[in-house]
Amino acid sequence: RASWPADFGMVADFWHRNNCTVLYAEQRGQNNSDGEYMGFGLTERFDCLDWVKYMNSRFGTALPVWLCGVSMGATTVLMTAGLDLPENGHGIIADCGFTSPGAIWKHVAEKNLHISYGLRSAVADAMCRRKILMGADDYSTVDALRAAKVPVMFIHGTDDRFVPISMTYENYLACASPRELLVVPGADHGMSYYLEKEKYEEQVLDFWHKYS
């Protein structure tokens, strides 16, 4: 299970150096957050929209809001792109997100675990429908991005052994809003910032300045 100190410990310094007001969130079913089950972005996208509304209730709507996430967090913020964000929602930064629960389960089963996903697919989907009332492929980042209205920056490492970079390419091509892509040669899953810190920061800052 992920936690924000583990996932954002390094990049947090970059955000604070650039005077960002940051809400660090642990998704449902993670550590101290409520909820028994992860929705792999399907349910968390609605939580994400609630977090934006919470920030606006605390700080007003004058500040631009950027949604950022890594891995399942990236999938969550990308799926949120399909919802009606407040007017101060300025953009999304998604680092190595997958396209849907079903797609990543299939990839991990076949490519990482080397097991057939055929029957397991039906079992996994049935459990998903029972626990979160949605099927594993009922919604995807591709669906969301076709309706995206805010700019999106996609980030992925070429050597990602968990989420294939092809999923980010698929997301990028589906995105209907202004989009940018940072590909980091040699970076494994979630390691792009650590491997190309200066390039990562430079491109994120440029993205912020362009769309703030």
Where in this protein do the model-derived segments appear?
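Conserved alpha/beta-hydrolase
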Residues: 12-34
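Alpha/beta-hydrolase active-site loop
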Residues: 38-59
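Hydrolase active-site cap/lid region
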Residues: 79-134
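Short beta-strand/loop motif that positions the catalytic acidic residue
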Residues: 147-149, 154-156, 160
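Short alpha-helix in the alpha/beta-hydrolase fold that links the catalytic acid
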Residues: 150, 164-173
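Acidic catalytic loop of the alpha/beta-hydrolase fold
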Residues: 158-163, 190-191
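Catalytic histidine neighborhood in serine/cysteine hydrolases
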Residues: 172-190, 203
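Catalytic active-site module of serine/aspartate enzymes centered on a nucleophile-bearing elbow/loop
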Residues: 195-212
